[in-house]
Amino acid sequence: MRGRLFVMTGASGVGKGTVRAKVLERTRLFYSISMTTRPPRPGEVDGVDYYFVDRPTFEALVREDGFLEYAEYVGHLYGTPRAPVERALSRGEDVLLEIEVQGALQVKRAVPEAVLIFLLPPSLSELKRRLVYRGKDSPEKIQKRLEQAEWEIRNAHLFDYVVVNDVLEEAVADFLAILTAERRRSGRMGEALEMALRRDLALEAELDEILRRRYGGTGH
């Protein structure tokens, strides 16, 4: 059975990376590492947090249709390399993407069965506090991120699920509950299809036997 594609998204500063790390500790998922043209932040490692590349390299991959999705956010390009995701899904592995909102909506258009989970801050004032205390952005960039966040929050209804990241452990538990529910739903669908196929095969065998008895041959 082909794997499921889960997409975590939300405003910058909402805590996607922290929630994602906790989720990956507690369940089996293939985590797809994104590519970006922004410079690494202190402590970030190339090939672990992101693949850090220059703009010409990124744009060359765009021309080769090498991204499942890509978008520009606050002056930098972000994208999900297509090949690793496709390989993992084909192996039957469930895949997790942690990407920007624009990219998540692109994925939903390209892969309608993808499950989009929007991570929401408890309030915009709390989001601003987190961005300020993170200490990574200038006041101008923080304001730009907040304006972007307002638009994203207004469009949260476009996503399959919304998780409020107020208390970290509660947000992680909610995220894991969504994964469990979706996996069970997929399992039930697979079982239902298998049962339907078995019924069809049994009916075909029964009809063949009736025809054989009636006409001394088969129905084929």
From Swiss-Prot:
Q: Where in the cell is it found?
A: Cytoplasm
Question: What SMART domains does UniProt report for this protein, alphabetically?
Answer: GuKc
Domain (Guanylate kinase-like): residue spans on this chain: 3-180
**Which terms in the Gene Ontology molecular function aspect does this entry carry?**
ATP binding; guanylate kinase activity
Q: What domain of life?
A: Bacteria
Q: List GO terms (cellular component aspect).
A: cytosol
Where ATP binds, per the record, is at 10-17
Catalyzed reactions? GMP + ATP = GDP + ADP
Sorted keywords for this record are: ATP-binding, Cytoplasm, Kinase, Nucleotide-binding, Transferase
Give the E.C. number(s).
Answer: 2.7.4.8
| Matches recorded under Gene3D superfamilies | Guanylate Kinase phosphate binding domain, P-loop containing nucleotide triphosphate hydrolases
Q: Main subcellular localization, coarse class?
A: cytoplasm
Name the protein family.
Belongs to the guanylate kinase family.
**Function per UniProt:** Essential for recycling GMP and indirectly, cGMP.
Q: Which PANTHER family match?
A: GUANYLATE KINASE, GUANYLATE KINASE-RELATED
Q: List the protein's name.
A: Guanylate kinase
What is the phylogenetic placement of the source species in the record? Bacteria, Thermotogati, Deinococcota, Deinococci, Thermales
Q: Which gene encodes it?
A: gmk
